């Protein structure tokens, strides 16, 4: 099931008008004309079978009607609804009654669908609890069980229990989960760690990759590839031995490198770009180029204001979601306009650092298993990637890593993503020292480190600080001997989260940290979410290292 693409349905079959056809971008390699189906989910004993149809695929014009009418304030609500009967029967009924004078779309949806539950709204925190106690008591609230799956819903069944971030996010997310796991380990929840380890391995086995999240509409993309970091955590905490995951790591690597060998310089296919000197680097990608199910109306509106073919904009919006940084000045040609997004034209520093970690992990585990040829091959791949990153993504003049615009052949903006090479051990000590100086002068605040130094209104920019960036910066700088900076970031972040907790009795997705007065972070396509998985995980781990703030 490796590396299968999305099947492109015939527009005539879907009864959708196609007004415009755009030629293939000359930079993008089309390897063949063969249509391949998206991988079908496997059966899980005792649970109804999932399928790969997204709500947009399944409900066609009904889906577009609901999303364009905005009968729910959040575009994610309808894709997360579950049908009360066979979806085909619902679509047939809709087609029969939609033109009736008294047709009420909202009532039709309410009569035919179960609305998604917001579990965390039932939880009321105890103001007397310490931050540590609050987090430990939240794990059961954020846990979902396999039997929670409903037939024909967009939720993909998983074999074991899992943690969700909270709020509108009622499914597990790939890269979020790694940072959540840090806290689970600190809380002694090895039971949940084992469940999540099994779930992610199961997804790789059955989908060929780990999707963005366990929803059908997330199958066409992944997220930052942190499974190698998860495996390292499992090994360190005695949850699972690393050797058992070697094949899974190789499968994930094959997903990210699909098509690489067929590329010529200055050409790209899916996640891979062949650079002018022949080296290989990676970018974020999504196999679909349609509006995202969960942000359908927002994507349509963004494309309208772009002046570009809509399918290009949709692809870049989807690739931005795959990056985990949705959205940020990192992906914008004009930092004031989301419509200028060009995610697929950037070589991201964090993605290539995570893939360096993946290559290194495969080499290290292969060595443990005595597979010398595989070890040598992947050590060479990791070394080649490090060299390519240093050639294209290292700004020697300013002493920082930056993303690289491979279409324009120039360095892009500086952001906190630059700390990931330190976290995975890809930088040398001189680079780490110079980067530390840049972070101190450009990103460090009394509340932690900013996502970027640009104010754009996007959530992964100034004035916001995010838990995963703090963790990777803390550990990354300490790994290279800069305990002073690492400890300063840690204590600043703990102070931010604790001060907000004492006032609001909750942890949230992101924090406004630009001026030393912690408050709710803003920006983005949806209201601020509380819960919150990865904030809980990072803070719980930091409490274990530094004590209660």
From Swiss-Prot:
Optimum pH is 6.0. Its EC number is 3.2.1.28. It catalyses: alpha,alpha-trehalose + H2O = alpha-D-glucose + beta-D-glucose. Induction: Weakly induced by high osmolarity but not by trehalose. Expression is partially dependent on RpoS. The keyword Cytoplasm applies. InterPro entries: 6-hairpin_glycosidase_sf, 6hp_glycosidase-like_sf, Cyt_trehalase, Glyco_hydro_37, Glyco_hydro_37_CS. Gene3D superfamilies: 1.50.10.10. GO terms for biological process: cellular hyperosmotic response; trehalose catabolic process. Monomer. NCBIfam families: PRK13270.1, PRK13271.1. Belongs to the glycosyl hydrolase 37 family. This is Cytoplasmic trehalase. It comes from Escherichia coli (strain K12). The gene is treF.
């Amino acid at each position: 099931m490796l590396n299968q693409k999305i099947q492109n349905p015939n527009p005539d079959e879907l009864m959708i008008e196609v007004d415009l056809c755009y030629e293939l971008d000359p930079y993008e390699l089309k390897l063949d004309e063969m249509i391949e189906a998206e991988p079908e989910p496997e059966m899980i004993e005792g649970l109804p079978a999932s399928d790969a149809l997204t709500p947009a695929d399944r409900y066609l014009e009904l889906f577009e009607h609901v999303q364009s009418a905005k009968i729910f304030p959040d575009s994610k609500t309808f894709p997360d609804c579950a049908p009360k009967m066979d979806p085909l029967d619902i679509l047939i009924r809709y087609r029969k009654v939609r033109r009736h004078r008294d047709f009420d779309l909202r009532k039709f949806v309410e009569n035919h669908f179960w609305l998604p539950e917001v579990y965390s709204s039932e939880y009321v925190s105890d103001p007397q609890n310490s931050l540590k106690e609050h987090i430990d008591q939240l794990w059961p609230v954020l846990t979902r069980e396999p039997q929670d799956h409903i037939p024909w819903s967009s939720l993909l069944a998983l074999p074991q229990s899992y943690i969700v971030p909270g709020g509108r996010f009622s499914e597990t997310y790939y890269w979020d989960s790694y940072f959540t796991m840090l806290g689970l380990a600190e809380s002694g929840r090895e039971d949940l760690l084992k469940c999540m380890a099994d779930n992610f391995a199961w997804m790789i086995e059955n989908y060929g990759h780990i999707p963005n999240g366990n929803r059908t509409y997330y199958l066409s993309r992944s997220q930052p590839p942190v499974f190698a970091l998860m495996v390292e955590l499992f090994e360190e905490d005695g949850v699972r031995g690393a050797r058992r995951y070697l094949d899974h790591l190789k499968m994930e690597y094959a997903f990210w490198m699909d098509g690489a060998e067929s590329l010529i310089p200055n050409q790209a296919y899916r996640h891979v770009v062949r650079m002018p000197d022949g080296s290989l680097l990676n970018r974020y990608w999504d196999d679909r180029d349609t509006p995202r199910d969960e942000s359908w109306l927002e994507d349509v509106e963004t494309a309208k204001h772009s002046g570009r073919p809509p399918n290009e904009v949709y692809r870049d919006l989807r690739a931005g979601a795959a990056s985990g940084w949705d959205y940020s000045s990192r992906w914008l040609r004009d930092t004031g306009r989301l419509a200028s997004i060009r995610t697929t034209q950037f070589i991201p520093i964090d993605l290539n650092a995570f893939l360096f970690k993946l290559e290194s992990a495969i080499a290290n585990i292969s060595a443990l298993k005595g597979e010398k040829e595989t070890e040598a091959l992947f050590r060479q791949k990791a070394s080649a990637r490090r060299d390519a990153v240093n050639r294209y993504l290292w700004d020697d003049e300013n002493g920082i890593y930056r993303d690289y615009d491979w279409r324009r052949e120039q360095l892009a903006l500086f952001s906190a993503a630059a700390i990931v090479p330190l976290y995975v051990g890809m930088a040398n000590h001189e680079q780490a020292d110079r980067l530390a100086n840049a972070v101190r002068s450009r990103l460090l605040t009394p509340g932690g480190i900013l996502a970027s130094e640009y104010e754009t209104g996007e959530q992964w920019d100034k004035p916001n600080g995010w838990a995963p960036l703090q963790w990777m910066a803390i550990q990354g700088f300490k790994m290279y001997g800069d305990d002073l900076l690492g400890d300063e970031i840690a204590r600043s972040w703990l102070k931010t989260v604790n001060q907000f907790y004492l006032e609001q009795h909750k942890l949230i997705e992101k924090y406004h940290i630009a001026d030393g007065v912690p408050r709710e972070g803003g920006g983005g396509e949806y209201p601020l979410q509380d819960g919150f998985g990865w904030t809980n995980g990072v803070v719980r781990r930091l409490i274990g290292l530094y004590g209660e703030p």
